[in-house]
Structure formats: C-alpha cells, structure tokens
Curated annotation (Swiss-Prot):
Role of this protein: Required during biogenesis of c-type cytochromes (cytochrome c6 and cytochrome f) at the step of heme attachment.
Coiled-coil annotated spans: none
Gene: ccsA
Protein name, UniProt field: Cytochrome c biogenesis protein CcsA
Provenance organism: Olimarabidopsis pumila (Dwarf rocket)
Assembly notes: May interact with Ccs1.
GO MF term list: heme binding
Lipid bilayer topology: Multi-pass membrane protein
Amino acid sequence: MIFSILEHILTHISFSVVSIVLIIYFLTLLVNLDEIIGFFNSSDKGIIITFFGITGLLLTRWIFSGHFPLSNLYESLIFLSWAFSIIHMVSYFNKKQQNHLNAITAPSAIFIQGFATSGLLNKMPQSAILVPALQSQWLMMHVSMMILGYGALLCGSLLSIALLVITFRKVGPTFWKKNIKKNVLLNELFSFDVLYYINERNSILLQQNINFSFSRNYYRYQLIQQLDYWSFRIISLGFIFLTVGILSGAVWANETWGSYWNWDPKETWAFITWTIFAIYLHIKTNRNVRGINSAIVASIGFLLIWICYFGVNLLGIGLHSYGSFTSN
C-alpha cells in the first residue's frame, strides 16, 4: 500500500514538473523572460527534478515488484521518458548547445509520460508477476538498451526533422526587387535632384537590408550546422544502444526458444530500423553527400521507430505480444 501511494505521488510530481517546464520553455520563446527572472534556468532545474522523480518511480516499482520495471508498455514508456530526461541533463551540462536539445527533450518527455499515465493502457500501471518468457537475467540488458536506443534515435531524428524544416523554409528578402520596380516608376515622375535624394535613401535602406539578410542567413547556417552535428552524435549513440539491444535479444531468444532469430514482427521492424540508421551513418561518412540527404533518412527512421515500438503493441501478436495494449 505504501509503495503504491509513493508511486502515485512520484508519478504526479514528475508529470506536473515536466508540464511546468514545457510551459516555461515556450514562454521564453515568446517573451525574453530569461533575462528578467531567469525562467530558462528554472526550466533546466525542473527537468532535473523530473529526472529524480522518474528515477524514484522506477526504483519504487522495482522494489515493490521484485523485478526490473520493464515488463510492459507502461513501464517502458516511463523508462523512455527517463531516457529523454537524461539526454536533457547532458545538454544542461553542455551550456553551448542546451537550447536546441531542450526544444526536443521537454515536449517528448511530457508527451510520453502523459500518454503512459493517461489511463489508455488498461491495467498496466499495476505491477504484476513476470510472465515466464521475461524471467531472465537478460531482461535488464536487452530492454534497457532498446529503450535507450529508441530515446536517443528519436531525439536525433527530431533534430534532423528540425534541420529539414529550417533548410526548406523560404528565406531571402524581396526588398531589392520591390525597390527596382519603385525606381522605374519614380524615374517617370520626378526630377533628377529629387531622384538623387530618393536613390541615396534607398541605397542606405538596401544596404541595411542586405546586412540584415546576411546576418540572418549566417545565423541560419550556424543553426543548421549545430543541428546536424548533434543529430549525428545522438543518433550514433542511439545506434550503439540499438545494436547492443538487438544482439542481447538474439542471445536471450536462443536461450528461451532455441533460435537466435525468429522473424517476429518486433524483430523484423527492429532490423529494418537498424538498417535505416546504418544507412544514415554510412551517408554521414561520405563527404560528397549533402547533410540534407542524411536528415531525410533520419526522418524516415523516426517513423520506423514508432512503428517498431508501437506496431506490435497495437496488433498484439508475435513473441513480444506480452507488452501489447490488449494484454492484462
């Protein structure tokens, strides 16, 4: 009873704090509040509080159930939210790049934890005895590596999607185009002295507009480079986690079912996801290929991760069906 109450309190604390963090962060985007009362630092500290809250929640379920809390979809979602909070803390200690990652980790954490605690998962929030297939020492190794891999790959893929949005956004002032048309009309209406004054004024405005354009494009270029840099680093880390998770799962499957690979739906989609991100890393090693191509591949990988993670849970079939929406 005590563990259940403690778990309930920690769940609501972590969800409430991450909700406040998200509101604060979007307020700092709309209004420069961080210079007034330091709201942005408060949001970073809020994520740290969320991290310890989710950690306490996982430890409570571990002690209460007697097994590592990764036996169903609810627990895996909480663990995934915990993984996003870890990524956020890494960005917190790296002050130069924290803003870009915060825009990804905070909304992701609140969305995942909100879905996990929304009541859509039937009886999954209640701890239960492990099914025989999960009673193995490989549970912690395999599932934790897969979830950490999902978290890192999702974060890196979202950065790639942001890169694509910024890249394909139409940028470039049309001031000089309008200015040319205006000068043609003025030449027909005014004398030389008046035109000289107007042209001088327009030249100053045009130069200011060009300087602003160069400044904006330079910032845009720097932002694209940073997004590409961090996307590659985080996806590389997630790819390592995913590889270790798949290999440990193969060893576990051989011990349980006598075969390393059974082409289960979850296994098949995990292999497809692994292949897509292997292609992404291969593209990144080729300097002749533009970064936008790798970002497109990472965006495809983002969709595949959700298919792999939720696809089997929606269908409720295969060797991994014990974590489905319909299981009790």
